[in-house]
């Protein structure tokens, strides 16, 4: 892996955002896409024109050439070199049009994934058409139809409804457009899926709490408080199960209590407060499914004066929790990172190789996880 510096290849990535139901590409937008594709083709053949060569030399950053006829790489700054691995051996044979349908443009994790896809598209010299699924099945289906009408070559779909994913996959197959489903499968055993190990997401948290509880509270029998979000589907259920199983395998007598956060930090705070009121004594291991809600949990613990009685693990590695990780006296031990920053860099080489020569991605690709603690925070996030 090498550090790359940012330079936008002129016209390589046309970003279109489809946000409302029934949205279709306007003639003006289509013209912009056509113009961008033309510019990309011109940049690809710049070696044959001395004037274009001079322009390339004076542009910000440099291009890395592949074989004759392939789209050159544009160097892009990699902000998190300990997280992102750039496949420098893959080159696009053409300026393909990649559609990326985001889970929800208002979700912090989704935004990171979207930006990683855009950066990877810039690097590989392909166009990117961006959609927002809005966590809405109907919108996800509409986005698929719009992408088909726009003539995309590949579809990257981040959506957590399996039935809609399957319908999208079938519709794309009718048009000969390949797909990778992100985080949640489409058609089992048919469509490639890129997803984290949700069960391991929970076990990493449980393992850390078991270790810390034994060291911090020798001879004590702490209870386990699990703040999950089962309404959001199997991925979140698996995370909670992983945490519980990890703790119970090491401490089988542990009493377990569960709530739903309903995906809301304030609900998390209030239900944690109620739990602490009902359990005014003893040591507690706490787990929460996402960092933003963990902050609500922490607020309840602080208000109750129970900081010395509680240890907390979380999920997401969102910057909102980094300040707590830096504190030696914080009850927050760690947060599991799924490294959303690398998703696009993993996905684009698979898509490009399939478009180049028909090499289909594996049915399952699982990126690495790690739990971010005070000890390794700056290794992964130097600017935290």
Regions found by a protein language model. Give the residues of each.
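Hydrophobic alpha-helical
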Residues: 154-174, 243, 261-324
């Amino acid at each position: 892996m090498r550090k790359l510096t940012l330079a936008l290849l002129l016209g390589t990535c046309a970003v279109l955002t489809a946000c409302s139901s029934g949205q279709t590409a306007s003639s003006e937008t289509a013209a912009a896409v056509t113009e961008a594709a033309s510019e990309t083709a011109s940049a690809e053949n710049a070696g044959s024109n001395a004037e274009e060569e001079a322009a390339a030399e004076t542009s910000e950053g440099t291009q890395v050439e592949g074989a004759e006829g392939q789209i050159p790489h544009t160097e892009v700054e990699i902000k998190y070199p300990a997280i992102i691995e750039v496949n420098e051996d893959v080159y696009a044979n053409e300026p393909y049009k990649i559609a990326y349908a985001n889970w929800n443009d208002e979700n912090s994790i989704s935004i990171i994934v979207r930006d990683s896809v855009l950066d990877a598209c810039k690097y590989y010299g392909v166009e990117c058409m961006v959609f927002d699924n809005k966590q809405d099945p109907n919108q996800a289906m509409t986005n698929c139809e719009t992408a088909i009408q726009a003539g995309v070559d590949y579809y990257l779909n981040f959506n957590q409804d399996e039935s809609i994913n399957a319908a999208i996959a079938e519709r794309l197959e009718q048009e000969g457009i390949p797909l990778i489903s992100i985080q949640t499968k489409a058609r089992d055993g048919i469509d490639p899926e890129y997803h984290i190990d949700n069960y391991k997401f929970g076990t990493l948290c449980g393992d850390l709490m078991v270790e810390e509880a034994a060291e911090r509270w020798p001879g004590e029998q702490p209870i386990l408080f699990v703040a999950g979000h089962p309404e959001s589907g199997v991925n979140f259920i698996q995370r909670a199960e992983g945490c519980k199983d990890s703790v119970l395998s090491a401490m089988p007598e542990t009493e377990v209590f569960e709530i739903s956060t309903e995906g809301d930090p304030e609900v998390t705070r209030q239900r944690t407060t109620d739990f602490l009121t009902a359990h005014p004594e003893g040591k507690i291991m706490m787990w929460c499914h996402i960092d933003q809600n963990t902050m609500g949990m922490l607020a309840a613990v602080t208000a109750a004066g129970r900081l010395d009685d509680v240890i907390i693990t979380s999920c997401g590695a969102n910057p909102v929790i980094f300040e707590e990780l830096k504190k030696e006296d914080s009850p927050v031990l760690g947060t599991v990172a799924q490294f959303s920053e690398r998703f696009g860099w993993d996905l684009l080489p698979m898509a490009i190789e399939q478009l180049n020569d028909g090499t289909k991605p594996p049915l399952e690709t699982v990126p690495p996880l790690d739990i971010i603690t005070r000890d390794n925070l700056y290794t992964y996030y130097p600017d935290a």
